[in-house]
Amino acid sequence: METLAPFAAVLAGYLFGSLSFAVIVSRLMGLADPRSYGSGNPGATNVLRSGNRIAAVLTLALDALKGYVPVLLVLLFGPRAGLGTDTAAFVGLAAFVGHLWPVFFRFQGGKGVATAAGVLLALNPVLGAATLLTWVIVAAFFRYSSLASIVAAAFAPFYQALIWGVEPLLLAIGAMSLLLVWRHEGNLRKLLAGTESRLGQKAAAPAGTAPPHPRRGRGHQHGKHAGKGHS
């Protein structure tokens, strides 16, 4: 049974990560599906475009907890089943992958910024805090949330290797960072083209589209917008 424990923990992490709280919160609060407007990305930033700040904050918090809770549970109770920090790191990676490609939501997930932050804070609070501070500094200077996320993701494995050494969990952190940067490919193109939206600036809506509004029953649908945005 101990041989199966790591695989069961990783699977549980992925399934928990597959809970798309952007979609769930929006449904519970009577808002449009975040995959149907704005960037089409089910994340807190896109939910904020609905105009409902409470829904956006709830999405942000739950997405972060989605990465934090599975890792914390393994760290607290895993030793009884022979699971250590390395397993916890890969459980966190699995939760992050679940957010990116959620099995319960047709594999249409977000970009994982909040979930990655939750994973890092649970694995190593100092590393998590350093990474978040990097995000804040870059965002404050350049006013680009996507750029801040990309830079913070790039620095996270660097901090781990420089301060704590090349431990096995560096592999999980590095993989998470690479995936996060890759998911921001569209944002990178916009940054290079000078068309990326700054913090506090509404993303321009494609011509002929209406702003998001609450759902109006089962048959109502919203047109999907082209492009990808930061989440």
What is the predicted function of each stretch?
Residues 2-9, 26, 92-103:
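Short, hydrophobic/aliphatic alpha-helical segments
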Residues 12, 16, 21-68, 100-114, ...:
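Interhelical loop and helix-boundary elements at the membrane-water interface
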Residues 13-16, 95-99, 135-139, 156, ...:
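Alpha-helical transmembrane segments of multi-pass membrane proteins
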Residues 48-52, 74-78, 112-142, 154-164:
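Interfacial segments of multi-pass membrane proteins
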Residues 50-52, 56-59, 82-98:
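Helix-loop-helix "hairpin" substructures at the membrane interface of multi-pass membrane proteins
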Residues 68-72, 88-123, 129-132:
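Anionic-ligand binding patches
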Residues 129, 145-152, 164-176:
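Loop-to-transmembrane alpha-helix initiation sites
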